[in-house]
UniProtKB/Swiss-Prot annotation:
Keyword ATP-binding annotated: yes
SUPFAM superfamilies according to UniProt: Class II aaRS ABD-related (SSF52954), Class II aaRS and biotin synthetases (SSF55681)
Name of the gene: hisS
Organism annotation: Microcystis aeruginosa (strain NIES-843 / IAM M-2473)
Gene3D superfamilies the record matches: Anticodon-binding domain, Bira Bifunctional Protein, Domain 2
Record-level Gene Ontology MF annotations: ATP binding; histidine-tRNA ligase activity
EC number: 6.1.1.21
Protein name: Histidine--tRNA ligase
Amino acid sequence: MGEIQAIRGTKDILPAEVGYWQWLEETASRILGTALYQEIRTPIFEQTQLFERGIGEATDVVGKEMYTFLDRRQRSLTLRPEGTAGVVRAYIEHKLQAAGGVQRLWYKGPMFRYERPQAGRQRQFHQIGVELLGSDDPRADVEVITLASEILKAVGLENLKLDINSLGNAQDRQNYRQALLDYLTPYKADLDADSQQRLEKNPLRILDSKDEKTKIICENVPSILEHLGSDSQKHFERVQSLLTDLGVIYNLNPCLVRGLDYYTHTAFEIQSDDLGAQATVCGGGRYDGLIAQLGGLDTPAVGWAIGLERLIILLQQKQSLSFLVPDFYLVSKGEKAEARSVVLAQQLRGLGFSVELDLSGSAFGKQFKRADRAKAVGCIILGDAEAENGTVQLKWMATQEQISLTQADLLTQAGELKAQISRHKS
């Protein structure tokens, strides 16, 4: 039997990379916490009909990309291709709307789509997302947009570009549908096969086509912004006004429709030139009809999702993993010293230091080389003599300065040692 490897489109996240993920997730959690968003965790698989009804059967996601299977009771289940539908299902099932007011939720975790794997895009991929449920106020749209921008800036993204559009309400889209048909029908033979099928079912989806020829045809389509009713127009104008008040630069993109059918009114994407062809790092919008469509009360909502794989690529290029550098590397030689090293390492960790304990039992010279490779700030040296008299040797690796101090002082001078570690790291 040949070697068993990870399935194409999936990726092992190895220890050297996990630190980036943890830092990114912790940064997002901290920023979302300042706006009182609460984390929600939903199952990785759901009933298939949740996504068919929620995302839309005419979308690429439902039609081509979902991982769907029958369980032993012949129920059709699907690995979640996105996070919003599951959050909405939980919101309805657990009657979260009964609490009244606005619910601010966020999630993180893996999603699954059968797409062509490439850099920053896997078949199992990860997202952080937010959902603000219970408000149709344009301020809600702006709140989630600015939170996304704040997170992206906090993790080092530069050259951000915000594209916004309005998809209006159901009546607006019905009016626009006819204008689209009038424009696109003469080009039907030149459209890609998928777009030809969508022409009658859902022509708005054609604007989301990735086919180059179809994209050229769509460059001169009528703008949906010219077909908005007065209420939709007022909502979108208010969103733009609030963004301007905040100093947020945005670009009106009337071809921005997103890839999922549940979007209404405001739709947006945040892109970064730092990521080249895969420039979109965050996408979202308002989905005022989805909760009622899935059996809940008529409840407005808005949200977004950030794809983590693309951000991780950028972080690896821009950020050093200084948070994975041990404060101390503890070397020991001799039976008594090795026994004492276990206790000392645990005591230091209890004081908040990161400590790597050398377990090799090899000569001090080899242990010192491993301390160098670990990029430790300090090396604590413990031989049998030190174990006997209650001392240690502390060597600062950057300067090679070495001092002798008692083990008691090492533990009681934690504040001073942390200050020295900070100076050596900077």
